[in-house]
Amino acid sequence: MPRSDYLFTSESVSEGHPDKVSDRISDTVVDAYLAAMPEARLGVETLTTTNRVVIAGEVRGPDSVTFKDLEELTREAVRDIGYEQSGFHWKNNDVAIHLHAQSADIAQGVDAAGNKDEGAGDQGIMFGYAADETPALMPAPIFYAHKILKDLADARKAKQGDAAKLGPDAKSQVTVRYADGRPVEVTQIVLSTQHLDESLDSADVRAIVEPYILKALPQGWVNEGTVWHVNPTGKFVIGGPDGDAGLTGRKIIVDTYGGAAPHGGGAFSGKDPTKVDRSAAYAARYLAKNVVAAGLARRATIQLSYAIGVAKPLSIYVDLHGTGTVDEAKLEGVLMDALDLSPRGIRTALQLNKPIYARTSAYGHFGREPDADGGFSWEKTDLADKLKSAF
């Protein structure tokens, strides 16, 4: 029997965290190529460190996207995040770009004669998850850990009062108590944030961030028993890539469900949508969210698996965690019929061949609002009625 009374913790990191700066730059490169050629292929990794950005990887795309363009886009991304410090400044960083052509051996596995982009770009397993704990059908701990940091970043960028004294680099962690399987309160809050004013101590920083944290969390979830840890190490002035080197793809649990669901191991950022690490994980979330939105379960985990060069998934697995109203084996068949789970089918259904990825690089790929231009299309619940009618 699953436990119904327990504590569960998830963490998030801000857009200024070194690894997230790297994710942002990698996805900015992806967007640049997809904007020029929707069928572009990319696998882009970024290293960020003191006064330096290194971009490397494989590309199949138009020559119209130049390294000079990518350098300018990189500087714009770093500027948007907010880095103007001596050890990492959008204007002064050295930007080195090492991109080369995609391997012909990989390309032949993905291409099929007369049918471009037919096979999966790699083997792997991908998971999707949804739960009715929040309006976005996300687990509460990761949803609110993201919201805290997003709200603080918005306030910092808008220069709202003392929030302007905060820096781009931050981390949050939220511990939620569950009773009868439902989230009821926050027992621990951890927030570490860079601050530009060296005179600030932990108490000063808490005075700045506490109103935003309280507003981000559901009313009544924070009480006298909630324990706060705000900048517990004290001073946090040197932050971002100047404090720690960053790499693309190192925050895969932050990017997904905060540890509340399994993870297949593949990162998202820097990859075009022929890479099933990304597109199939989005499809699995889309299916899981629609299962919960349809009222077929309160929680749903979906696994997909693929082989390189093979169009159809090798398997699908559904776990409703004892909360379902339908047979899981039958639901697996219904889901296979409801959505073409080939890489091409996923890209077509979710309209993934668009420059929509830089925005996903911080505050979670899931639990976001769908955008009018196709961003976060996998968060739509337009499949719910179809799934419901199948039963």
From Swiss-Prot:
InterPro entries: ADOMET_SYNTHASE_CS (IPR022631), S-AdoMet_synt_C (IPR022630), S-AdoMet_synt_central (IPR022629), S-AdoMet_synt_N (IPR022628), S-AdoMet_synthetase (IPR002133), S-AdoMet_synthetase_sfam (IPR022636). It comes from Methylorubrum populi (strain ATCC BAA-705 / NCIMB 13946 / BJ001) (Methylobacterium populi). Catalyzes the formation of S-adenosylmethionine (AdoMet) from methionine and ATP. The overall synthetic reaction is composed of two sequential steps, AdoMet formation and the subsequent tripolyphosphate hydrolysis which occurs prior to release of AdoMet from the enzyme. Belongs to the AdoMet synthase family. This is S-adenosylmethionine synthase. Pathway: Amino-acid biosynthesis; S-adenosyl-L-methionine biosynthesis; S-adenosyl-L-methionine from L-methionine: step 1/1. Binds 2 divalent ions per subunit. ATP binds at H17, D169, A170, K171, K235, F236, D244, R250, K251, A267, K271. Keywords: ATP-binding, Cytoplasm, Magnesium, Metal-binding, Nucleotide-binding, One-carbon metabolism, Potassium, Transferase. Residues 1-20 are annotated as: Disordered. It catalyses: L-methionine + ATP + H2O = S-adenosyl-L-methionine + phosphate + diphosphate. Homotetramer; dimer of dimers. One of its GO terms (cellular component) is cytoplasm. Its EC number is 2.5.1.6. PROSITE patterns: ADOMET_SYNTHASE_1, ADOMET_SYNTHASE_2. The gene is metK. The keyword Cytoplasm applies. Gene3D superfamilies: 3.30.300.10. It holds the Pfam family S-AdoMet_synt_C. L-methionine binds at E58, Q102, D244, K275. Residues 102-112 are annotated as: Flexible loop. One of its GO terms (molecular function) is methionine adenosyltransferase activity.
